[in-house]
Each structure stands twice: as structure tokens, then as C-alpha cells.
């Protein structure tokens, strides 16, 4: 049986991960992944430096290795009023995948972040916590995926996310939210 393993939510040392982008890609390639996205945390303070570094690293990896490495970013703990602007800026800087740090129950994420995210130009609402049906419906209409998270803590609400997606027609994606080799 042929299977394809991808992960579109992973972190390098460009934010709070511990591996370089190259080592992250190499380890994933050795484990049989066919594609990964490097989606380091950004806000208005670092988006202009982090995204171009991810793009450069992914371009070099893709020239030499079989694993497809996709440059991305994760908008994290920002004022909800600038989520849309940051999504546009990250894409303009060359990122191919935009994810938003959703309202996980294990961090003090600003209420309304999920809603602002599904109104913005993002691809995945990661660890969306106790997402409501209205936001899940908007995600479904805009082809924004809701994440089922493999990360400790964020995974507490996976059942709710799955049921809400099933009820509203939103698409799901499983990601690890990896920050280290043990993730």
C-alpha cells in the first residue's frame, strides 16, 4: 500500500523549535514524509525576517532533496485587528502556507481570534479549541482547514473540532505542531 505522509504545521529554531529548517526536513525525510511546511511563529515584530529565512531555506532544500518543503508562517497571539494584514504580508514575502494560532484552551489566546482568522487569507486554523459552528461554516465556505492537533494540550479539543467540522462541512487536517525531534 502506498501512503503519503505530510505535515503542514512544524516549527524550526526560527521561532520556538529546536532544529534548523534543514535538519527538520532531513529528519522528516528519513521518517518517510513526502512534504512538510515550516510554519514558524510570527507577529508584526518578526514577520519581515522570519518568512524570508524560511523561504530561502525551503528553496535550497527543494533544490537538493526529494522531500517537498513548503515555506509558511503561523500568526501567533497578535491583535485580532491585524491578522488579515499579517496574512497578506506573509504571502507577499513568499510564504505558500498561512496558518493562524487558534483559540486553544491551553493558552490565553484572545477571544475572537478564530473568527478573525477565518475572515483572513489563511489556509489552516490550527488548534482552534472550542471553535463555534459559525466560524467552522465560514472556514468550510473559504476552504480553510481546521486542524486536528497531535500536540499535547492542544489535542484536548480534537473531538469537539472533529464533530463541529462534520456538522458544518469544514475540512480537517492532522498536523503534529512539531517543535522538537520528540514531537
PLM-predicted stretches and their roles:
Residues 1-5, 14-34, 46-49, 55-65, ...:
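Metal-centered catalytic cores of metalloenzymes
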Residues 4-6, 37, 71, 174:
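Residue-level marker for buried hydrophobic side chains located in beta-strands
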Residues 5-15, 38-41, 128:
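Histidine-centered catalytic micro-motifs
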Residues 11, 42, 74-76, 103, ...:
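Catalytic metal-binding/acid-base residues of hydrolase active sites
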Residues 36-38, 126, 147-148, 172-176:
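Short hydrophobic alpha-helical runs that function as membrane-insertion/retention elements
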Residues 41, 170-183:
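Short acidic/histidine-rich active-site segments
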Residues 47-147:
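Extended substrate/RNA-proximal surfaces in nucleic-acid metabolism proteins
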Residues 108-110, 134-136, 155-160, 183:
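Short, charged, surface-exposed secondary-structure boundary motifs
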Amino acid at each position: 500500500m502506498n501512503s503519503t505522509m505530510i505535515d503542514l504545521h512544524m516549527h524550526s529554531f526560527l521561532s520556538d523549535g529546536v532544529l534548523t529548517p534543514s535538519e527538520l526536513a532531513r529528519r522528516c525525510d528519513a521518517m518517510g514524509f513526502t512534504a512538510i511546511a515550516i510554519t514558524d511563529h510570527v507577529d508584526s515584530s518578526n514577520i519581515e525576517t522570519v518568512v524570508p529565512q524560511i523561504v530561502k531555506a525551503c528553496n535550497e532544500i527543494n533544490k537538493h532533496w526529494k522531500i517537498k518543503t513548503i515555506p509558511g508562517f503561523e500568526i501567533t497571539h497578535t491583535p485580532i485587528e491585524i491578522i488579515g494584514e499579517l496574512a497578506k504580508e506573509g504571502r507577499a514575502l513568499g510564504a505558500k502556507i498561512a496558518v493562524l494560532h487558534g483559540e486553544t484552551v491551553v493558552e490565553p489566546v484572545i477571544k475572537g481570534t478564530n473568527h478573525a482568522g477565518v475572515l483572513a487569507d489563511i489556509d489552516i486554523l490550527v488548534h482552534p479549541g472550542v471553535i463555534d459552528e459559525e466560524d467552522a461554516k465560514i472556514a468550510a465556505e473559504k476552504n480553510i482547514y481546521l486542524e486536528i492537533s497531535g500536540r499535547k494540550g492542544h489535542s484536548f479539543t480534537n473531538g469537539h473540532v472533529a464533530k463541529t467540522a462534520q456538522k458544518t462541512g469544514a475540512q480537517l487536517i492532522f498536523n503534529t505542531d512539531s517543535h522538537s525531534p520528540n514531537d
